[in-house]
Design a protein with these regions (language model features):
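Single conserved hydrophobic/aromatic residue that forms the stacking wall/gate
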Residues: 1-11, 194
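Acidic/histidine-enriched ion/cofactor-binding microenvironments in catalytic or ligand-binding pockets
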Residues: 52-81, 159-195
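Hydrophobic, small-residue-rich alpha-helical packing segments that form membrane-like cores
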Residues: 8, 12-139, 144-146, 154-156
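Short, flexible, glycine/charge-rich loop motifs used to bind or transfer phosphoryl groups or to couple energy/partner
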Residues: 1-3, 33-34, 62, 168
Length: 195
Protein backbone atom coordinates (compact mmCIF):
# COMPACT_ATOMS: atom_id res chain seq x y z
CA UNK A 1 0.00 0.00 0.00
CA UNK A 2 2.75 2.49 0.89
CA UNK A 3 4.45 1.80 -2.44
CA UNK A 4 1.22 2.55 -4.34
CA UNK A 5 0.69 5.76 -2.37
CA UNK A 6 4.28 6.84 -3.09
CA UNK A 7 3.80 6.20 -6.82
CA UNK A 8 0.63 8.30 -6.87
CA UNK A 9 2.29 11.06 -4.84
CA UNK A 10 5.22 11.13 -7.27
CA UNK A 11 2.80 11.72 -10.14
CA UNK A 12 1.05 14.43 -8.12
CA UNK A 13 4.19 16.54 -7.66
CA UNK A 14 3.27 20.03 -8.85
CA UNK A 15 5.01 21.29 -11.95
CA UNK A 16 5.78 24.66 -10.38
CA UNK A 17 8.48 23.00 -8.26
CA UNK A 18 12.12 22.71 -9.19
CA UNK A 19 14.05 19.42 -8.99
CA UNK A 20 15.33 19.99 -5.45
CA UNK A 21 11.85 21.06 -4.34
CA UNK A 22 10.38 17.87 -5.82
CA UNK A 23 12.90 15.78 -3.85
CA UNK A 24 11.96 17.53 -0.61
CA UNK A 25 8.21 17.31 -1.29
CA UNK A 26 8.41 13.58 -2.02
CA UNK A 27 10.35 12.94 1.20
CA UNK A 28 7.75 14.99 3.09
CA UNK A 29 4.99 12.77 1.61
CA UNK A 30 6.90 9.65 2.67
CA UNK A 31 7.51 10.87 6.21
CA UNK A 32 3.73 10.99 6.72
CA UNK A 33 3.48 7.22 6.11
CA UNK A 34 3.23 5.23 9.33
CA UNK A 35 5.96 2.66 8.57
CA UNK A 36 8.48 4.97 6.83
CA UNK A 37 11.92 5.20 8.46
CA UNK A 38 14.24 6.96 5.98
CA UNK A 39 15.09 7.13 2.23
CA UNK A 40 16.71 4.01 0.77
CA UNK A 41 18.83 6.11 -1.61
CA UNK A 42 19.17 9.70 -2.82
CA UNK A 43 16.20 10.69 -4.96
CA UNK A 44 16.82 11.24 -8.66
CA UNK A 45 14.57 14.08 -9.85
CA UNK A 46 15.46 15.16 -13.39
CA UNK A 47 13.49 17.56 -15.55
CA UNK A 48 13.99 17.99 -19.30
CA UNK A 49 17.60 17.27 -20.30
CA UNK A 50 18.55 16.35 -16.72
CA UNK A 51 16.13 13.42 -16.91
CA UNK A 52 18.33 11.90 -19.63
CA UNK A 53 21.31 11.63 -17.28
CA UNK A 54 21.31 8.17 -15.70
CA UNK A 55 21.65 8.50 -11.91
CA UNK A 56 21.47 12.31 -12.11
CA UNK A 57 21.67 14.14 -8.79
CA UNK A 58 20.28 17.69 -8.63
CA UNK A 59 22.34 20.33 -6.84
CA UNK A 60 22.12 24.12 -6.54
CA UNK A 61 24.09 24.58 -9.77
CA UNK A 62 22.16 22.07 -11.94
CA UNK A 63 18.71 22.50 -10.36
CA UNK A 64 16.00 23.17 -12.98
CA UNK A 65 12.42 24.31 -12.69
CA UNK A 66 10.00 21.56 -13.74
CA UNK A 67 8.26 22.99 -16.80
CA UNK A 68 4.96 21.90 -18.31
CA UNK A 69 6.64 21.01 -21.63
CA UNK A 70 9.29 18.80 -19.97
CA UNK A 71 9.41 15.11 -19.30
CA UNK A 72 10.16 14.55 -15.62
CA UNK A 73 11.98 11.47 -14.28
CA UNK A 74 11.73 10.63 -10.59
CA UNK A 75 13.49 7.62 -9.04
CA UNK A 76 13.22 7.35 -5.27
CA UNK A 77 12.90 4.82 -2.51
CA UNK A 78 12.26 4.33 1.15
CA UNK A 79 13.18 2.07 4.03
CA UNK A 80 9.99 0.89 5.71
CA UNK A 81 9.58 -1.41 8.70
CA UNK A 82 8.47 -4.16 6.32
CA UNK A 83 10.98 -3.65 3.51
CA UNK A 84 12.88 -1.49 1.06
CA UNK A 85 11.41 0.24 -2.00
CA UNK A 86 12.73 1.63 -5.28
CA UNK A 87 10.09 3.47 -7.33
CA UNK A 88 10.69 5.09 -10.73
CA UNK A 89 8.14 7.22 -12.56
CA UNK A 90 8.37 9.13 -15.84
CA UNK A 91 5.84 11.93 -16.16
CA UNK A 92 5.03 13.82 -19.35
CA UNK A 93 3.07 16.94 -18.41
CA UNK A 94 2.38 18.02 -22.01
CA UNK A 95 0.86 15.93 -24.80
CA UNK A 96 3.68 13.65 -26.00
CA UNK A 97 4.57 13.47 -29.68
CA UNK A 98 4.35 10.18 -31.61
CA UNK A 99 8.05 9.38 -31.16
CA UNK A 100 7.81 9.71 -27.38
CA UNK A 101 4.62 7.61 -27.33
CA UNK A 102 6.30 4.91 -29.44
CA UNK A 103 9.40 4.74 -27.24
CA UNK A 104 7.38 4.84 -24.01
CA UNK A 105 5.18 2.00 -25.30
CA UNK A 106 8.25 -0.09 -26.15
CA UNK A 107 9.75 0.47 -22.69
CA UNK A 108 6.40 -0.48 -21.14
CA UNK A 109 6.27 -3.66 -23.25
CA UNK A 110 9.75 -4.54 -21.97
CA UNK A 111 8.60 -3.97 -18.39
CA UNK A 112 5.53 -6.16 -18.93
CA UNK A 113 7.67 -8.87 -20.56
CA UNK A 114 9.83 -9.08 -17.43
CA UNK A 115 6.87 -8.87 -15.05
CA UNK A 116 5.04 -11.73 -16.78
CA UNK A 117 8.02 -13.94 -17.66
CA UNK A 118 7.95 -17.61 -16.72
CA UNK A 119 11.05 -17.95 -14.59
CA UNK A 120 11.40 -21.67 -15.24
CA UNK A 121 12.14 -20.78 -18.90
CA UNK A 122 13.92 -17.44 -18.41
CA UNK A 123 15.86 -18.41 -15.32
CA UNK A 124 18.80 -15.99 -15.47
CA UNK A 125 19.09 -12.23 -15.36
CA UNK A 126 20.73 -12.32 -18.79
CA UNK A 127 17.70 -13.99 -20.39
CA UNK A 128 15.24 -11.61 -18.71
CA UNK A 129 17.33 -8.59 -19.73
CA UNK A 130 17.24 -9.69 -23.36
CA UNK A 131 13.44 -9.98 -23.19
CA UNK A 132 13.15 -6.48 -21.68
CA UNK A 133 15.28 -4.87 -24.40
CA UNK A 134 13.58 -6.69 -27.29
CA UNK A 135 11.04 -3.98 -28.18
CA UNK A 136 13.57 -1.13 -28.11
CA UNK A 137 16.15 -3.21 -30.00
CA UNK A 138 13.61 -3.71 -32.82
CA UNK A 139 14.06 -0.01 -33.68
CA UNK A 140 17.81 0.04 -32.91
CA UNK A 141 17.48 1.66 -29.48
CA UNK A 142 18.88 0.49 -26.15
CA UNK A 143 19.75 1.74 -22.68
CA UNK A 144 23.09 1.76 -20.90
CA UNK A 145 22.20 0.08 -17.62
CA UNK A 146 20.90 -3.22 -16.35
CA UNK A 147 17.15 -3.76 -16.47
CA UNK A 148 16.90 -4.63 -12.80
CA UNK A 149 18.82 -5.30 -9.63
CA UNK A 150 18.40 -7.18 -6.41
CA UNK A 151 16.65 -5.17 -3.70
CA UNK A 152 17.93 -5.59 -0.14
CA UNK A 153 16.20 -5.14 3.17
CA UNK A 154 17.81 -2.37 5.25
CA UNK A 155 21.10 -2.92 3.44
CA UNK A 156 21.68 -1.60 -0.07
CA UNK A 157 18.80 -0.94 -2.40
CA UNK A 158 21.10 -2.41 -5.11
CA UNK A 159 22.02 -5.84 -3.81
CA UNK A 160 23.25 -9.03 -5.46
CA UNK A 161 24.14 -11.51 -6.58
CA UNK A 162 20.86 -11.45 -8.54
CA UNK A 163 20.31 -8.85 -11.27
CA UNK A 164 18.57 -8.46 -14.61
CA UNK A 165 21.53 -7.54 -16.78
CA UNK A 166 23.35 -8.44 -19.99
CA UNK A 167 26.22 -9.62 -17.81
CA UNK A 168 24.42 -11.62 -15.12
CA UNK A 169 24.10 -15.38 -15.49
CA UNK A 170 23.15 -16.06 -11.86
CA UNK A 171 20.25 -18.50 -11.76
CA UNK A 172 17.19 -16.78 -10.31
CA UNK A 173 15.60 -18.53 -7.36
CA UNK A 174 12.47 -18.24 -5.24
CA UNK A 175 12.79 -15.49 -2.65
CA UNK A 176 15.09 -13.27 -4.73
CA UNK A 177 13.63 -9.77 -5.00
CA UNK A 178 14.40 -7.79 -8.15
CA UNK A 179 13.53 -4.37 -9.52
CA UNK A 180 12.15 -4.08 -13.07
CA UNK A 181 13.49 -0.85 -14.59
CA UNK A 182 13.89 -0.82 -18.36
CA UNK A 183 14.20 2.70 -19.74
CA UNK A 184 15.36 4.91 -22.54
CA UNK A 185 17.40 8.09 -22.14
CA UNK A 186 18.17 10.39 -25.04
CA UNK A 187 19.92 13.74 -25.12
CA UNK A 188 19.21 15.75 -28.23
CA UNK A 189 21.74 18.08 -29.82
CA UNK A 190 20.45 21.27 -28.21
CA UNK A 191 19.89 19.59 -24.79
CA UNK A 192 16.44 21.15 -24.56
CA UNK A 193 14.39 17.99 -24.39
CA UNK A 194 14.59 14.39 -23.33
CA UNK A 195 12.77 11.19 -24.20
Amino acid sequence: RDLTVTGVQTCALPIWLDELGAEKKLEKFRKKRKNFLYPSFNTIAGSGPNGAIIHYRANKKTNRKIKSKDIFLCDSGGQYKYGTTDVTRTICFAKPNNRIKNIFTRVLKGHIAVATAELNKLNTGYKLDKKARHWLNKINLDYGHGTGHGVGYFLNVHEGPQAISKYNNIKLQNGMILSNEPGYYEKNKDRKSVV
